[in-house]
């Protein structure tokens, strides 16, 4: 089989969450960081024929780039990758027992109880992430202010050590309520697409996209 570009994009993103990954047979993949702060699921265009694990997903993807028109043949203990010009790569699987694996599903609360919910456009997410990197800001904040229903997404420093901020209005709250939630910037390094964002005050959020779903912990200050 050949991997679609969209599948490779998701795998690269998941490698940023955890380099180790167990991939199950089928077209749904999942990963979790070692701190249990971020869990991600994706429905991909490709369907893997077997279950296998890798210690270093980034290394695996880089190895595939060594071959032109890579064709993958998944065996019991390794995958054989062939390419143009007679090139061949044999990549050994890892022991799945030593790789952090995400649960099959996350039970997200149905009631937000003072939390937040809004639609986030991919271009707005991309701009805030770029601002965070450009200005060296470690946090991303979702907030409203007293007397306003406007929801703001901003790149900032939760500890106040930087005076730089960058913010975008991303929607309106259903009611006039005040809230403020912080994320570590690196945890919002998710694939740029439109998401339905739900944040629960207990410290968990869900970013639901067309084919992607991320559960990300908010930060207690």
UniProtKB/Swiss-Prot annotation:
Keywords: DNA replication, Viral DNA replication, Viral transcription
GO biological process: DNA replication; viral DNA genome replication; viral transcription
Disulfide bond annotation, renumbered to this chain: none
Example of a GO MF term: DNA polymerase processivity factor activity
Role: Sliding clamp that encircles the genomic DNA and links the DNA polymerase to the template to control the processivity of DNA synthesis. Responsible for tethering the catalytic subunit of DNA polymerase to DNA during high-speed replication. Interaction with the sliding-clamp-loader opens the sliding clamp so that it can be loaded around the DNA template. During transcription, encircles the DNA and tethers host RNA polymerase (RNAP) to it.
Assembly with partners or alone: Homotrimer. Interacts with the viral DNA polymerase; this interaction constitutes the polymerase holoenzyme. Interacts with the sliding-clamp-loader; this interaction allows the sliding-clamp-loader to open the sliding clamp. Interacts with the viral DNA ligase. Part of the replicase complex that includes the DNA polymerase, the polymerase clamp, the clamp loader complex, the single-stranded DNA binding protein, the primase, the helicase and the helicase assembly factor. Interacts with the viral RNA polymerase (RNAP).
HAMAP family noted in UniProt: Sliding_clamp_T4
Recorded family membership: Belongs to the Tevenvirinae sliding clamp family.
Name assigned to this protein: Sliding clamp
Organism of this sequence: Vibrio phage KVP40 (isolate Vibrio parahaemolyticus/Japan/Matsuzaki/1991) (KVP40)
Organism phylogeny: Viruses, Duplodnaviria, Heunggongvirae, Uroviricota, Caudoviricetes
């Amino acid at each position: 089989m050949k991997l679609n570009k969209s599948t490779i994009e998701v795998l690269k993103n998941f490698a940023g969450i955890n380099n180790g990954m167990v991939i199950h047979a089928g077209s749904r993949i999942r990963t979790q960081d070692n701190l249990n702060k971020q869990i991600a699921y994706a429905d991909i265009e490709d369907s893997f024929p077997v279950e296998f694990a890798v210690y270093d997903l980034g290394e695996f993807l880089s190895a595939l780039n060594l071959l032109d028109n890579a064709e993958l043949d998944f065996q019991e203990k390794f995958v054989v990758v062939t390419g143009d010009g007679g090139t061949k790569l044999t990549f050994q699987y890892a022991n799945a027992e030593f790789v952090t694996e995400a649960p099959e599903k996350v039970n997200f609360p149905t009631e937000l109880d003072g939390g937040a919910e809004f639609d986030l456009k991919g271009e707005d997410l991309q701009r805030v992430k770029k601002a965070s990197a450009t200005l060296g800001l470690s946090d991303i904040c979702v907030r409203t202010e007293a007397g306003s229903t406007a929801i703001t997404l901003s790149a900032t420093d939760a500890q106040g050590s930087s005076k730089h901020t960058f913010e975008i209005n991303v929607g309106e709250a259903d009611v006039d309520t005040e809230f403020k939630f912080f994320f570590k910037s690196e945890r919002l390094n998710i694939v740029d697409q439109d998401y339905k964002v739900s944040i629960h005050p207990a410290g968990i959020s869900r970013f639901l996209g067309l084919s992607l779903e991320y559960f990300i912990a908010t930060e207690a200050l």
